[in-house]
Amino acid sequence: MVRGPKKHLKRVAAPHHWLLDKLSGTYAPKPSPGPHKARECLPLIVFLRNRLKYALNGREVKAILMQRLIQVDGKVRTDSTFPTGFMDVISVEKTGEHFRLVYDIKGRFTVHRITAEEAKYKLCKVKRVQLGAKGVPFLVTHDGRTIRYPDPLIKVNDTIKLNLETNKIESFIKFDTSAQVMVTGGRNMGRVGTIVHREHHLGSFEIIHVKDALDREFATRLSNVFVIGEAGKSWISLPKGKGVKLSITEERDRRRALKGLA
């Protein structure tokens, strides 16, 4: 009889966006319980060893972490399987590097370097707003944070700008047409665009129509949309490609053009 949670994760069952090859072992790192879901996170060991190449194996990753050199959202993390996720800020003290976890146009976490100034804040999507004990208002964000006494104008699906040093809300963006968004789920994952139209469907999913920088329109569910800026201006720096998805022929032409320049 099976008792308790699973403590192992087979390599073939690991999320595809971790980009682990099947022949390098039987098992993959099992994410610890934390602020992000297991299928939507990137364990610290995968980020440091497989993406940054700062370590050759898990033992070296553990040695780096136990020196308390790695911070996630301003807090030192020593757990090699700590689940980092979308919008998290990872800082490496020795090198002075800062990274923000965002998706590329293929829906994978990309190594996106940011400045020290940008590393002082992160954006959080509001998942819930309600009253707690003794009538205290609070909100819950996509990364599991609970913030008491928020601005009464902040509603569900809005995005807050959180100062990681003070853990206070600096500003917020309303979820509305003309807001700039990044898609965090579905087949359009990683694409960036502007909200054009919102379809309301009672008893079903609300559909959001988004137009990207090339004036291509696509639709996705409301739950897959994360507001990252106001009209025409993103509050965070974007990775290479700026969230614009090219067709197969356009990617081919761009590769040929780059090869011709080389």
From Swiss-Prot:
Listed GO MF terms: RNA binding; rRNA binding; structural constituent of ribosome
Signal peptide: none
One GO BP: cytoplasmic translation
Tagged with keyword rRNA-binding: yes
S4 RNA-binding domain span: 42-105
Alphabetically ordered keywords of this record: Cytoplasm, Nucleus, Phosphoprotein, Ribonucleoprotein, Ribosomal protein, RNA-binding, rRNA-binding
Chain positions with Phosphoserine modification: S223
Keyword Membrane: no
Cellular compartments annotated: Cytoplasm; Nucleus, Nucleolus
Gene Ontology cellular component annotations, sorted alphabetically: cytosol; cytosolic small ribosomal subunit; nucleolus
Function, as annotated: Component of the ribosome, a large ribonucleoprotein complex responsible for the synthesis of proteins in the cell. The small ribosomal subunit (SSU) binds messenger RNAs (mRNAs) and translates the encoded message by selecting cognate aminoacyl-transfer RNA (tRNA) molecules. The large subunit (LSU) contains the ribosomal catalytic site termed the peptidyl transferase center (PTC), which catalyzes the formation of peptide bonds, thereby polymerizing the amino acids delivered by tRNAs into a polypeptide chain.
Miscellaneous comment in the UniProt entry for this protein: There are 3 genes for eS4 in S.pombe.
Family: Belongs to the eukaryotic ribosomal protein eS4 family.
Subunit organization: Component of the small ribosomal subunit (SSU). Mature yeast ribosomes consist of a small (40S) and a large (60S) subunit. The 40S small subunit contains 1 molecule of ribosomal RNA (18S rRNA) and at least 33 different proteins. The large 60S subunit contains 3 rRNA molecules (25S, 5.8S and 5S rRNA) and at least 46 different proteins.
The protein, known as: Small ribosomal subunit protein eS4B
Taxonomic source organism: Schizosaccharomyces pombe (strain 972 / ATCC 24843)
Lineage: Eukaryota, Fungi, Dikarya, Ascomycota, Taphrinomycotina
